[in-house]
Amino acid sequence: MDETKRSKQEALDKRYIRMASIWAENSYCQRRQVGALIVKDKMIISDGYNGTPSGFENVCEDENNLTKPYVLHAEANAITKIARSNNSSNSATMYVTASPCIECAKLIIQAGIKRVVYSEKYRLEDGIELLKRAGIEVIYMSIES
């Protein structure tokens, strides 16, 4: 990729990761709000944020402030929306505000996503390592950058 294309791609990446951050504000979760966008050919084809499944009360934490086990991650919400649409995530880019966990990494691989841009590092790196092992381009990008 030449310098001009790289610069344009970086500018797009910055915009989309900021948009994912704004989308995270839709989450009802108190402990952590995470947003994800799936982009293909410069079009947002899906979005998601962490939260409870459809039809459940929008309360993510239990009385001990622990995340309930059935809360969906932003990445899973975005990928399942694709599955219910006419879109394909094959060769798309996912922008997500937190580094994917191992379970979401498996979904990303199976969805055919080829790039992941994330803005917040998580204490566990196993999801990132799995994505790289699968040949997915992984980019850390601070929202402030």
Language-model regions, residue ranges each:
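Zinc-dependent deaminase catalytic domain
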Residues: 1-145
